[in-house]
Amino acid sequence: MVAITAGNASVRFTGFFSESKSMSDSFNTRKQFTAGDRSFDFFSLKALEEQHPSVATLPYAQKILLENLLRHEDGSNVSKSDIEALANWDAKAEPDTEIAFTPARVVLQDFTGVPAVVDLAAMRDAMANLGGSPDKINPLSPAELVIDHSVMVDEYGSSGAFDLNAKLEFNRNKERYAFLRWGQGAFDNFKVVPPDTGIVHQVNLEFLARVVFGNEQTNLAYPDTLVGTDSHTTMINGVGVLGWGVGGIEAEAAMLGQPITMLIPQVVGFKLSGKLAEGCTATDLVLTVTEMLRNKGVVGKFVEFFGDGLADLPLADRATIANMAPEYGATCGIFPVDGETIRYMELTARPKEQCQLVEAYAKAQGMWREDGQPDAQYSDVMELDMSTVQPSLAGPKRPQDRVLLSDMQKTYQREVKSFVKDRQDKDDKSMAEAREEGEGGTPSKSVGGSAPVKYRDAEFNLQDGSVVIAAITSCTNTSNPA
């Protein structure tokens, strides 16, 4: 914390630029391990296990939190008693102990990221006005902003649509993009992924995720963790990275090195066995999982997937399930690191040294998943044999409302009656039109149960129940060919 005074004005900056901070190691857990031909320091959970044997049975997600506390123990934000509380976690107890979690990085999208960069720029102006060095104002945690939310589709259905949309996008957002480009050059620890690269969660999963950080300056290895400014940030849980969505203010605080306070969460274990039947996709699986977890009630809890079924679950499918955590109500839906994680990292062209680091670290920490290993202690356990999953659809209104494909006809016949009734409700229609006219709107002509459509040289009617293919971009399946 530094206070700068100019005349009668004074501003106190906390956590906006690096200062030496004394860290403790009350349990003497800082050890070394080897990855390839390199050696790293790390805070060993196995060393802590010698003093607190219950660490061995902690869920994967709790081990990530525990390592985070060990690494950030300072006697203030993180105390020895905080570490002991998590090391001796009672899986069945109601959460009542607050801890300080410090994410390793922050992921932003452009709508929420631009205000954050504006705030940093304003802090630099304030620092300069008070006679200080504005260059000292930087994010302490790596912040990565992916431009995707401002993308609009003006042209479609043609081979030149992508190039035209990209050109229009750059022209439309020229000032914003120029500002972000300036920010990337001006601030340390701040990177911008340009538009037309992909949806933020896809970019995070396929390019940005380290899974394990190897800090060259401190020679310290530690898990990749994050918070993001989008509810579906949880997609990154599929690759074994703990992270979830937060608001813009929380994200800015994390960028500036401030921990996020949270109660030690309950962890619901979701045991997967078997494998998907021929003709079933990850979408069918995720709709089934979402329905089960919504019925169970997992709000405010972590969900952790485990079991030998993971051996037959590709990482793209894991990411699809993890992405839907907001829909089933959990804070996160995480998968442990295993051989499939490494295979995916190799598939997405991660360096060989990074893959070696991730595998060696996970094994050294007792966080590597293998078939047949003992189950962790969970607050509750649910089970699903994936061979029982059937082709499904979502809706008609909410993604957690699952409909079996075999039941689609009768479900449609039931649901369409309520839609028709709503459409024929004259009183409600009159009230809506009166309200719209009062607010300056003009009521449109009702199309009834059908609407004429002209596409290129063809003309036809769309009716209730027509089957159409819509160009809907869904982040849930972005990184999944299924």
Give, region by region, the residue ranges found by the protein language model.
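Glycine-centered signal
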Residues: 4, 15-17
